Amino acid sequence: MAVLSNDKRWLVTLVASNKVLAPVLPEIVKQGMGNLYTFLDNHLSALPTRCSLTTLTYADVRRLTATPSPASFLESLNFGNINNNSDVHGNKKKAYNYNVSSPVDLARLYLPNYLAVFSAFDKSMDMSATLRLLGRKNYPIQIFLSSDPLHNIQSLADDVRENVRNRASHFDESHWTQIFFDQCFDKLKNLVQGLPLSVAKKEELLDQLSKWKIKGNFN
């Protein structure tokens, strides 16, 4: 059975996103979250009332919220996503285990529950999760920096998540015109250009995307 042009463009965009871009994002997130974890742990250990991420308690989080600091935001994070808190305690936040044992746990705190199911910074991470983490703009420090100052990783990742990943995940045949297909690949390429990767790696990824785009245009 012949594949319609719009269907083919959708499939090619989905496959190219998952095969070319998705595999390189977890390592970038890993580096950023590792830096954030170290920053927060150092900050907590330097406070008059010391604590740490690995020993964090509900009382610590409440106390930190009441005092303006780089850790004041902790209460707003999704602690239900770690230590089986939601499964065991539901919405009873006072009963949660607030220990943040690793950068992976820290990353899971920033995500909605349905995306916080990965166990490492690897292929178990959904691309939507990595794009959300890359696109977030309110970390206490800047943890994702482009190798090119003209590019803003947060905006580029958000653009890909909203206008490529989400649109491909919720298929509507009428969207997948030639113009929209071209725009999707432009957004994917723009994100690659903004990632903190070597020139050689960027060229490799851009070349792969170009080849996939040709497949989407070939009838």
Explain the meaning of each model-derived region.
Residues 1-167, 171-219:
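Feature for intrinsically disordered/low-complexity regulatory segments and propeptides
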